[in-house]
């Protein structure tokens, strides 16, 4: 309770206007108008000579890709090896039809591909799977109504060149007229990032409007004065314009880089901080005026009581945000310098422009006079309760903190940026169209490359390549693996060993009828042989008869020779007797004319032939005897010949049976082999995969090689699709398994020792997850150390600095837990992975401000004793700090209107943290700890628990004062 007590009526003593004043506030007050004009000129120059912050952010946007991450290194190396470009920016163009895509859609697609390939400035390469028959089925949906092509763009994701490339691709697509019923979407990671930046820039103006609306309402509620609120808004607007202009100037001249997150956070943080500092300054000025000080004294009291707090607060925020520069992820790294520079500008404006405006406006009547007394009594009652029951109040504050802390174990994060962007963004619409026909992972694949020291375009290495693909496909959660051995995600048809064997029997199948005809002709030969056998048997019978006849003829001829010789002898006797008569016939000249003569002469000539005949018969007899000898031998040979013919017949029949059975068996085997090959093909079983060497000369296959093997054949890549969302925790967890599977698959093979590179969506977010953990640790520890040092310098107390930092950490955990409770468990939206790091750094910095102001005020009042100092500090700073905290909290919560859900989550998390810090930590927890620790709170400083007794002031120096 405050009691106004007045000393004896000896007259008040006017303040000494010639007393020594601090140099800096005196110079600011003296040159207030030039300072204001200087700031106005600077602000005008900065905002006129360079474009606005949003425009500069678009022009000088930096890449959000972590270049040092293994996945980024892998993707760039893959692009270099395959000669497809050196950027990490890729877009997907999706064609969706109401009916299966036909020739018209394909013609449009070919025309679009030609236009894209012609734009070498923005398009580095294409993966034209749909245009190649070998891989077409892999790029078209199962219902035939959608197809896609991947385009590698110039510039890394997030850079102005990448965003320009996305716009160039969109322009090319928009200028082409698709067939009726076909829609074309430009989507993919690069398009999503570009749309995110545009959405963030659109949201920034809305956020600024909502923020100023919130600030105006809060200021009017707190100060109940339009003029005071207008003056404070002027200070805030000028500070914001200076910050925007300064950062835009540095960004425009490429001194610093900017991102969507940096510009959004910078604007809101600058507004909130500038508002806080304006509240600190004007609040302390009005408090001094309320205690009876004149305007000049109140000005110096204001500056002396808040300048070090504003400086410490600003340096804390600037230093903590600058610690983000030590991180490795560009998402955080790009925030560090812009936010730190922006906060330095805000602090500079608050410590120069703010006091100058107060110095000028305080000279004009009652512009800054308090319209009502500050609510000191209520806050002093809170301070008195804390001093009286510090333990229970501290326990109650900790219990409230446990509400959020107990929620933290259930915290889950999400890496899918699509879930945090409006569904009507063009890139999101493209993703939605793709997901109507493809799995979610098809648009976000992984790419694994194995790089060896030799050319892999041979059958042996292709066996290993297929082994790698099978090993990756066997990893749990992998739904599809595309490689040269499975271009469309399934094994190439007719590449199993059983099928190749069945194909080798194709020629046998073609000659089967011919062989069967030849076998059938063997029966004809058997019939011919049988006919020969029959004839031979008849010949044998005839030969036997001939032998018998010949033998009889020899016997008869032997007798005939004797008879003929006897006949010759008798004729010789006759001739000897009639020789004289015979001679007459030869002497007669006219014997020819005398018939009797010529007849008798002819008889005698005939008798002369008996000798010749006898001689011939004698010569014939040995021959007949020889024939008589041979004929039995010939007859004896005939049965053997007949038996041989019969044996030939039997062999021919046996051969026929064998050939016929063999042919039937081969036909059956061919049918089994063909059935086995067809079964292996139908089952997509590539356990016995093999590509014969002649396949590598096939022109179609060579086109497929270009897609999956590097130009020199030393590297092969695999396109991997997950089951479900690759950006989920489960998808991220598969990355290590994929690498392990590939590494194990090449053990003991010709590819052992080859380098393995893995990039893609889940791989990148795994690196982001790992980097986020590392960056959070680095930024958090460095920010805590920096904040502790600043608090130590400001309070000159190790314990007080430790308490401030400790309570801020506790507040951070509680507020983040509350954010998890609201967003994850109530709204059903998991917190984006960026939220934790951004909220932690800003809450660490901003949360320490209000504790710092409280402890600084407590330090001013400590001469009255610890307990009394706590009560006075609570009464003097309670309303100001609460107003500042509420304004800052609701200002950050204005992010809730952003199109970027991640910024809404960051803003609400920081806002809830500031509310908890303002209403619980600063109001109850920190003063309770100070009351419990007593003089140890100020160690190593020495303070008294109670004030040193002093004599009652003399009447001559009596003044109106306040007693507790």
Curated annotation (Swiss-Prot):
PANTHER family: MEMBRANE PROTEIN MJ1562-RELATED, MEMBRANE PROTEIN YDGH-RELATED. It is a multi-pass membrane protein. Pfam families: MMPL. The gene is mmpL5. Keywords: Cell inner membrane, Cell membrane, Membrane, Transmembrane, Transmembrane helix, Transport. Its main location: membrane. It comes from Mycobacterium tuberculosis (strain ATCC 25618 / H37Rv). This is Siderophore exporter MmpL5. Belongs to the resistance-nodulation-cell division (RND) (TC 2.A.6) family. MmpL subfamily. InterPro entries: MMPL_dom, MmpL_fam, Mycobact_MmpL. The chain crosses the membrane at residues 31-51, 203-223, 230-250, 255-275, 302-322, 340-360, 389-409, 773-793, 803-823, 826-846, 880-900, 923-943. It is found in: Cell inner membrane. One of its GO terms (cellular component) is cytosol. Interacts with MmpS5. Can also interact with MmpS4. Induction: Repressed by MmpR5. Repressed by iron. Regulation is IdeR-independent. Part of an export system, which is required for biosynthesis and secretion of siderophores. Overexpression of the system confers non-target based resistance to azoles, clofazimine and bedaquiline, via an efflux mechanism.
């Amino acid at each position: 309770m405050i009691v106004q007590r007045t000393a004896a009526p000896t007259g008040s003593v006017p303040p000494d206007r010639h007393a020594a004043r601090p140099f800096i506030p005196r110079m600011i007050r003296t040159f207030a108008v030039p300072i204001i004009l200087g700031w106005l000129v600077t602000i005008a120059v900065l905002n006129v000579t360079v474009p606005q912050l949003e425009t500069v952010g678009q022009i000088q946007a930096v890449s959000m890709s972590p270049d040092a991450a293994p996945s980024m290194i892998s993707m760039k190396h893959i692009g270099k090896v395959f000669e497809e470009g050196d950027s990490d920016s890729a877009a997907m163009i999706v064609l969706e039809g109401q009916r299966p895509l036909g020739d018209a859609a394909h013609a449009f697609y070919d025309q679009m591909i030609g236009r894209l390939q012609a734009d070498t400035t923005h398009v580095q390469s294409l993966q034209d799977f749909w245009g190649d028959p070998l891989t077409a089925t892999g790029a078209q949906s199962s219902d035939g109504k959608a197809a896609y092509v991947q385009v590698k763009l110039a510039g890394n994701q997030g850079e102005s060149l990448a965003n320009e490339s996305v716009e160039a691709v969109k322009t090319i697509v928009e200028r082409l007229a698709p067939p009726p019923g076909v829609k074309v979407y430009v989507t993919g990671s690069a398009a999503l990032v570009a749309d995110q930046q545009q959405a963030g820039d659109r949201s920034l103006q809305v956020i600024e409007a909502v923020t100023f609306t919130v600030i105006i309402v809060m200021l009017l509620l707190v100060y109940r004065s339009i003029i005071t609120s207008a003056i404070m808004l002027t200070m805030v607007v000028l500070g914001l314009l200076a910050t925007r202009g300064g950062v835009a100037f540095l960004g425009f001249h490429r001194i610093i880089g900017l991102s969507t997150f940096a510009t959004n956070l910078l604007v809101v943080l600058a507004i909130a901080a500038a508002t806080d500092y304006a509240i600190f300054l004007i609040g302390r000025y009005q408090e001094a005026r309320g205690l009876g000080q004149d305007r000049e004294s109140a000005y110096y009291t204001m500056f002396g009581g808040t300048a070090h707090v504003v400086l410490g607060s600003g340096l804390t925020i600037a230093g903590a945000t600058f610690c983000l520069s030590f991180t490795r992820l560009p998402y955080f790294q790009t925030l560090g310098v812009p936010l730190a520079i922006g906060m330095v500008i805000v602090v500079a404006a608050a410590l120069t422009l703010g006091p100058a405006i107060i110095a000028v406006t305080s000279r004009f009547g009652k512009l800054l006079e308090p319209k009502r007394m500050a609510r000191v009594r209520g806050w002093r009652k809170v301070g008195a309760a804390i001093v009286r029951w510090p333990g229970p109040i501290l326990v109650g504050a900790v219990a409230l903190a446990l509400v959020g802390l107990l929620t933290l174990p259930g915290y889950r994060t999400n890496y899918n940026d699509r879930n945090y962007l409006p569904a009507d963004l063009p890139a999101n619409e493209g993703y939605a169209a793709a997901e109507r026909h493809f799995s979610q992972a098809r648009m976000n694949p992984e790419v694994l490359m194995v790089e060896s020291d030799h050319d892999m375009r041979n059958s042996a290495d292709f066996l290993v390549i297929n082994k790698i693909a099978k090993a990756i496909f066997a990893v749990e959660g992998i739904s599809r693996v595309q490689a040269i051995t499975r271009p469309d995600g399934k094994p190439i048809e007719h590449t199993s060993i059983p099928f190749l064997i069945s194909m080798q029997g194709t020629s046998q199948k073609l000659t089967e009828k011919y062989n069967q005809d030849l076998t059938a002709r063997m029966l004809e030969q058997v019939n011919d042989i049988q006919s020969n056998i029959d004839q031979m048997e008849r010949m044998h019978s005839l030969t036997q008869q001939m032998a018998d006849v010949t033998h009889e003829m020899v016997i008869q001829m032997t007798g005939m020779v004797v008879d003929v010789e006897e006949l010759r002898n008798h004729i010789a006797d006759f001739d000897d007797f009639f020789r004289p008569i015979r001679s007459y016939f030869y002497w007669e000249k006219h014997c020819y004319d005398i018939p009797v003569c010529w007849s008798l002469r002819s008889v005698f000539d005939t008798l002369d032939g008996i000798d010749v005949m006898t001689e011939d018969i004698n010569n014939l007899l040995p021959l007949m005897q020889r024939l008589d000898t041979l004929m039995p031998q010939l007859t004896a040979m005939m049965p053997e010949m007949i038996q041989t013919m019969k044996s030939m017949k039997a062999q021919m029949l046996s051969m026929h049976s064998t050939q016929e059975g063999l042919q039937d068996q081969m036909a059956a085997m061919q049918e089994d082999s063909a059935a086995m090959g067809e079964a292996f093909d139908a089952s997509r079983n590539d356990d016995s995969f093999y590509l014969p060497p002649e396949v590598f000369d096939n022109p179609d296959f060579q086109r497929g090689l270009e897609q999956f093997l590097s130009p020199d054949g030393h590297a092969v890549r695999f396109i991997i699709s997950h089951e479900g969302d690759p950006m989920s925790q489960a998808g991220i967890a598969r990355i290590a398994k994929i690498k392990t599977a590939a590494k194990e698959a090449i053990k003991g093979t010709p590819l052992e020792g080859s380098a393995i590179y893995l990039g893609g969506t889940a791989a990148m977010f795994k690196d982001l997850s790992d980097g986020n953990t590392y960056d959070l640790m680095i930024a958090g520890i460095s920010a805590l150390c920096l904040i502790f040092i600043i608090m130590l310098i400001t309070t000159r107390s190790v314990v007080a600095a430790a308490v401030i930092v400790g309570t801020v950490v506790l507040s951070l955990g509680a507020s983040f837990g509350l954010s998890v409770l609201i967003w994850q468990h109530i709204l059903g939206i998991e917190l984006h992975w960026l939220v934790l790091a951004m909220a932690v750094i800003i809450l660490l910095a901003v949360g320490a401000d209000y504790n710092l102001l409280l402890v600084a005020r407590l330090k001013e009042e400590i001469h009255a004793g610890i307990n009394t100092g706590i009560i006075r500090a609570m009464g003097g700073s309670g309303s100001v700090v609460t107003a500042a905290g509420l304004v800052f909290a609701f200002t950050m919560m204005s992010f809730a209107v952003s199109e970027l859900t991640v910024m809404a989550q960051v803003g609400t998390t920081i806002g809830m943290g500031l509310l908890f810090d303002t209403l619980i930590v600063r109001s109850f927890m920190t003063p309770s700890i100070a009351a419990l620790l007593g003089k140890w709170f100020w160690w190593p400083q020495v303070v008294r628990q109670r004030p040193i007794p002093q004599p009652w002031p003399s009447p001559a120096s009596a003044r109106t004062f306040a007693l507790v």
